Amino acid sequence: MPLAIKINPKDNVVVALHPIAKGTAVPVDGASVTAVEDIPQGHKMAIAPIHAGENVIKYGFPIGHATADAVPGTWMHTHNVKTNLSGEIEYSYHPNVHPLAPVAPETFMGYRRKDGRAATRNEIWIIPTVGCVNDCAKALVRDNQDLVTDSIDGLYTFTHPFGCSQTGHDHAQTRKLLAALARHPNVGAVLVLSLGCENLTHEQFLTELGEYDHDRIKFLTCQDVDDELVAGREILKELAAYAAQFQREPISSSELVVGMKCGGSDGLSGITANPTIGRFSDMLCARGGSTVLTEVPEMFGAEGFLMDRCQNEKVFEKAVHMINGFKEYFISHNEVVYDNPSPGNKQGGITTLEDKSCGCVQKGGSAPIMDVIGYGDAVTTKGLNMLYGPGNDLVSATALTAAGAHMILFSTGRGTPFGAPAPTLKIATNSQLAAKKSTWIDFNAGVVADGEKTLDEAGADLYQLVLDVASGKQTCAEKKGFREISIFKDGVVL
């Protein structure tokens, strides 16, 4: 079992796959480097002299610079490495696009909607347009579980505090996000629940929603009825009868849309779980499916890896606009763009934002980037897509769901229990986490660090698990009933 890994031949550090004690000789490139201090798992060790001001190279890319001279065997982390990042950058397009060889798709057992779209779940959702009716929505879910029969996979609501006391861009984003959730293919039927006096009016929601199936989506305004729980049950009976007509049938994996996200990352994220997701992404895209990469702030410092893979200059310009637009968002709030790695990230071995970003983008595999889409917009292009969204787990996972993701692959080195509205598969970066939190973790990519599987083998295993989940196998979060949303907010609350 290897002690450490040199990710790229250009690197001047290795990453400890397991804790390395001071004095341990670590094999590197046919020789050995002796650790001059303890190196925690997931952390970096210098394998060559690195002078103060010299770049620290990982993934073949500068992830920061040394702030003090370091001899081989030195622990390289926040105490002696700093970021190179600043503000906006002038980007230029240098195409490095390598289309994937097509592969015949497999099938999964999914649902076929009347509009032709594929689905992996057949649920009834109650979507509140305003936080004032959150408890009404929860009561309707609680009191109507008897309607979950036959092929209906569940009755759920997604509460939030917005829909009123918002103006401008925030109000528009809330409206757009909620309408996008109502259109999600995994929803067999939808009850849109309103109060009646909120900023997000019924008419505004209808305008945002556009054309819709009146049997699939129904509305209830609580102020218009004597008892909203009685009226709501009658509507839910109709929606349940509509949703029950859908049955699972064989569907091509080329119709899958899968979101990709990481959270609670550690030093192994970019070595095990994220590249495993990247292998999966390439497999699905080669079969004609779609994957979605988001977390724009966690692309800072590694965006060049992605931009040169844009399929053409139009997509490249959209990517530039997205990256610099998010930097402007930070700067407008007097925030520095590089102040990202969390305490948990740092404890797990991530030192700078470049370090985190280089690991984050591994989820994108090697496929060309076919499109860049905005917050609340749906995926319309096959292949790898980039989505405007923050690094925050709940906000970005909600955005992935709104984009039409049938499920979300979520890598984590620290562990997290949450689930999005779409089935959320947790992928552990290390075997210790997978063993400790077996009720959170769906897939253990730590087998790569343990030497039990190659990345290609782990990616193939993950692909099969995705087909199983698409066919109805529940994720850990689904089994616990963990699912929620969080809406991106920028402005004032009235």
PLM regions: where:
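Metallocofactor- and cofactor-centric catalytic cores in central/energy metabolism, strongly enriched
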Residues: M1-M407, R414-L494
